[in-house]
């Protein structure tokens, strides 16, 4: 269930850079390809990388494209080089098409601290993040929404407001539009020719549905043994991508380890040495799990549609109401979905048989809230390697930082 204003904000965010310029995709692909090939060369030279079950990624991407859906991959976050490291280890067939190169999020304070870096990471298909309700998340929802799909059942006023280009296509139906616009959405689909025209109006150009890769923990986590390679809870921004896209993406869990050996968090104060190879010869493993059942995702989306119908704000019907943003029922639904996604990633970890079983407390947002607020005093048995970057005083460079991880 999508809201027109969310899609509109997403398009406005993407339009901040000239993504529709004829040269953009060429330069973007060159940027991505150069970075990924450089990473691939370095990792293969200094380390021992292994990618497991890549056929599951092949199947998920093929299924997504065949069913006109996006692909969403979710992975644990062990190192600042997880991306591009993870993507660079994939076979070359994933690197040669700009529409198959993943989109992703990047920390605003690291990736977008200067105009030059902002251009570089935008060309690299990375969006800057600060908070759960922000332009980059709206943009991700728009990216995950196929260009010829609409979901306006709750927007009968659509003709009276400024709309994203896709919504304008429905208005072109003129007198064909019934009072129930949702019926028009279900029965009137843009032709392939119309879709090409629509894509030229969008703030980015693509010929296939997209792939978005997310680290739902939000922050890198490196813990000392026996808690090593555990995860934080998953922030519910990831849930918005699944609940609010016009069509549910194919969701594929991924678990990795070994990237933390390349850049250990306790090398933070080593200056330039931090970015030199550490632990040369270490193994790096990326393992793909099974795609999450479509029925499970649809059950969550069904509950979301019920909440949208019940808590729509008549004053701003095309947008998320305060209740849909911050109400307990909406937060609980997003939290449940985020926890479910985490369980799927955790199942891959546990199935490896390499690490001690993860402590149940690590999936609890309340544990991490207390641990972070007290800067570790609430549970001194859990030891960080390096810093816990979720601590607010370490995030002063983000004036809009909020602890919104329910």
Question: PLM features: residue spans?
Answer:
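Fungal C-terminal region signature
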Residues: 2-5, 9, 293-406
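A transmembrane-helix-recognition feature enriched in membrane-embedded lipid enzymes
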Residues: 4-54, 88, 93, 116-123
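Short interface patches used for recognition in eukaryotic signaling and trafficking proteins
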Residues: 21-23, 72, 326
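Charge-dense, low-complexity intrinsically disordered segments
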Residues: 25, 29, 228, 328-335
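Soluble catalytic domains of membrane acyltransferases
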Residues: 48-303
């Amino acid at each position: 269930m999508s809201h027109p204003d969310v899609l509109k904000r997403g398009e406005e965010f993407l339009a901040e850079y000239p993504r529709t310029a004829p040269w953009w995709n060429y330069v973007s692909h060159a940027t991505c390809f150069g970075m990924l090939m450089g990473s691939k060369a370095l990792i293969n030279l200094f380390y021992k990388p292994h990618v497991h079950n890549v056929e599951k990624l092949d199947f998920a991407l093929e299924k997504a494209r065949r069913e006109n859906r996006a692909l969403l991959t979710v992975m644990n976050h062990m190192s600042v080089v997880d991306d591009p490291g993870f993507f660079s280890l994939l076979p070359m067939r994933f690197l040669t098409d700009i529409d198959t190169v993943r989109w992703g999020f990047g920390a605003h304070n690291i990736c977008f601290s200067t105009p030059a870096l902002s251009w570089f990471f935008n060309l690299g298909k990375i969006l800057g993040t600060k908070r759960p309700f922000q332009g980059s998340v709206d943009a991700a929802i728009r990216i995950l929404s196929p260009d010829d799909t609409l979901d306006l059942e709750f927007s009968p006023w659509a003709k009276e407001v400024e709309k994203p280009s896709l919504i304008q296509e429905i208005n072109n139906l003129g007198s064909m539009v019934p009072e129930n616009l949702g019926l028009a959405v279900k029965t009137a689909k843009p032709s392939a020719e119309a879709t090409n025209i629509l894509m030229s109006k969008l703030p980015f150009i693509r010929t296939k549905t997209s792939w978005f890769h997310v680290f739902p923990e939000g922050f890198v986590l490196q813990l000392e043994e026996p808690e090593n390679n555990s995860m934080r809870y998953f922030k519910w921004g990831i849930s918005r991508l699944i609940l609010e896209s016009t069509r549910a993406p194919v969701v594929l869990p991924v678990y990795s380890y070994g990237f933390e050996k390349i850049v250990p968090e306790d090398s933070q104060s080593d200056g330039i040495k931090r970015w030199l190879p550490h632990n040369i010869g270490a193994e790096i493993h990326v393992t793909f799990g099974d795609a999450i059942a479509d029925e499970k995702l649809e059950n969550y989306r069904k509950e979301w549609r019920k909440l949208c119908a019940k808590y729509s704000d008549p004053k701003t019907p095309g947008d998320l109401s305060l209740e849909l943003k911050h109400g307990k029922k909406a937060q609980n639904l997003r939290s449940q979905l985020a926890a479910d996604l985490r369980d799927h990633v955790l199942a891959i970890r546990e199935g490896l048989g390499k690490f001690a079983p993860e402590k149940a407390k690590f999936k609890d947002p309340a544990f991490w809230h207390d641990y972070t607020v007290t800067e570790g005093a609430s549970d001194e048995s859990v030891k960080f390697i390096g810093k816990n970057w979720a601590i607010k005083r370490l995030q002063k460079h983000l004036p809009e930082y909020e602890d919104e991880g329910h």
